């Protein structure tokens, strides 16, 4: 799916997005964000959507939230409440300098973007050495057959998500990132919470 198609899809999704995802995503979001190191000062949220992560962010941090969809970001404004800077931009071409963030959140975004490997590469680029990357999304595991999920992939892509992304395939392209925690998060482990650290 192209970013133009994503824009159209999320214009439709935006009014119902919260109702669709809050139920299964609230607890994993909170659990992931609770792992943000106390020393973190600059946090980037890639794929911020309607701002469902914002209530869980720590105090006294500089928070930047990015999304490609204007329709989604408009709904994030009340949750930002002056504590989060909102940026409309492409996750595959981040408008930030290298190593500028202590922590990056990627919740329900890698299975949405057209090229998840590019989005992960960009997240790694703007994460400082020693920084933390927190991911929550649906992934297949290496070698997992999951015929129904693979069969649904073309249909789900038309609905602005994918069901056939293997995270380990993405990670092999990023040797500077170490996976330090991998927890099942929802739907029998299809959704996972991942914590990664960038090597110094």
Model-identified regions with their sequence ranges:
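Short glycine-centered segments of the SAM/dcSAM-binding site in methyltransferase folds
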Residues: 42, 130-132
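A short SAM/SAH-binding and catalytic strip from SAM-dependent methyltransferases
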Residues: 103-115
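N-terminal, positively charged/glycine-rich alpha-helical extensions of SAM-dependent methyltransferases
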Residues: 1-13
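C-terminal alpha-helical "lid/dimerization" subdomain adjacent to the S-adenosyl-L-methionine
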Residues: 4, 20-23, 134-194
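A short acidic, Gly/Pro-enriched loop at the edge of an enzyme's catalytic core
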Residues: 92-104
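A short glycine-rich, Lys/Arg-flanked "PGG" loop and its adjoining helix->strand segment in the class I
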Residues: 117-129
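Class I SAM-dependent methyltransferase SAM/SAH-binding core
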Residues: 42-93
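Conserved alpha-helix/loop element of class I SAM-dependent methyltransferases that forms part
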Residues: 23-41
């Amino acid at each position: 799916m192209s970013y133009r198609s994503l824009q159209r899809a999320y214009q439709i999704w935006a009014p119902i997005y919260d109702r669709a995802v809050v139920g299964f995503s609230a607890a994993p979001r909170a659990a992931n964000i609770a792992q943000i190191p106390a020393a973190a000062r600059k946090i980037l949220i890639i794929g911020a959507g309607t701002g469902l992560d914002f209530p869980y962010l720590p105090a006294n941090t500089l928070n930047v939230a990015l999304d490609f969809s204007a329709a989604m970001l408009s709904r994030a404004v009340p949750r930002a409440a002056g504590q989060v800077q909102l940026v409309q931009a492409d996750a595959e071409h981040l408008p930030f300098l290298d190593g500028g963030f202590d922590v990056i959140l990627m919740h329900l975004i890698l299975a949405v973007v057209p090229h998840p490997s590019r989005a992960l590469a960009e997240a790694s680029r703007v994460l400082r050495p020693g920084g933390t990357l927190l991911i929550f999304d649906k992934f297949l595991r290496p070698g997992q057959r999951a015929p129904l999920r693979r069969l649904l992939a073309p249909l789900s892509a038309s609905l602005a998500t994918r069901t056939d992304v293997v995270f380990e395939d993405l990670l092999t392209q990023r040797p500077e990132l170490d996976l330090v925690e991998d927890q099942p998060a929802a739907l029998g482990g299809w959704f996972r919470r991942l914590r990664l650290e960038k090597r110094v």
